[in-house]
């Protein structure tokens, strides 16, 4: 999609054939409508080069990408992986094989050692927030020590 946008903008700027410009205007106007900076017109209606340049500048100023992407947010999977990494780094999880039971015990130990979290053994929102706000955790001794 981004490559198509770059090619379309290049075609408009370089003034290629009328057919190439028409195809590029159609794709570019659809992208601009996704971003929301051009009025809702038919993709085949002729936009001037100035309208497209204005729309792309407005999109860049507002921080949107040309493909209409939104800023990436943390998903549950990423939060879960972040907590697991935290547990491994501070020796709450030791060993190669990780089972749901070992994760539950490690989360219970983290929640107990925090002193402020409810001990549920589940990676919940307060636990995730604790891990995010406490980058230097209490290190558990390795099981062999």
Curated annotation (Swiss-Prot):
InterPro entries: PGBD-like_sf (IPR036365), PGBDSf (IPR036366). Residues 1-20 form the signal peptide. Gene3D superfamilies: PGBD-like superfamily/PGBD. Keywords: Signal. This is Uncharacterized protein 114L. It comes from Invertebrate iridescent virus 3 (IIV-3).
């Amino acid at each position: 999609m981004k490559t198509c946008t770059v090619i379309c903008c290049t075609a408009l700027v370089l003034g290629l054939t009328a057919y190439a410009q028409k195809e590029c205007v159609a794709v570019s106007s659809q992208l601009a409508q996704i971003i929301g900076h051009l009025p809702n017109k038919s993709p085949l209606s002729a936009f001037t080069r100035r309208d497209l340049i204005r729309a792309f500048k407005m999109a860049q100023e507002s921080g949107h990408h040309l493909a209409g992407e939104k800023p990436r947010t943390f998903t549950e999977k990423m939060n879960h992986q972040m907590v697991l990494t935290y547990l491994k780094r501070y020796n709450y999880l030791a060993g190669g094989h990780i089972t749901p039971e070992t994760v539950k015990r490690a989360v219970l130990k983290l929640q107990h050692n925090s002193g402020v979290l409810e001990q549920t053994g589940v990676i919940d929102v307060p636990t995730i927030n604790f891990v995010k706000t406490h980058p230097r955790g209490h290190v558990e001794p390795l099981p062999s020590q």
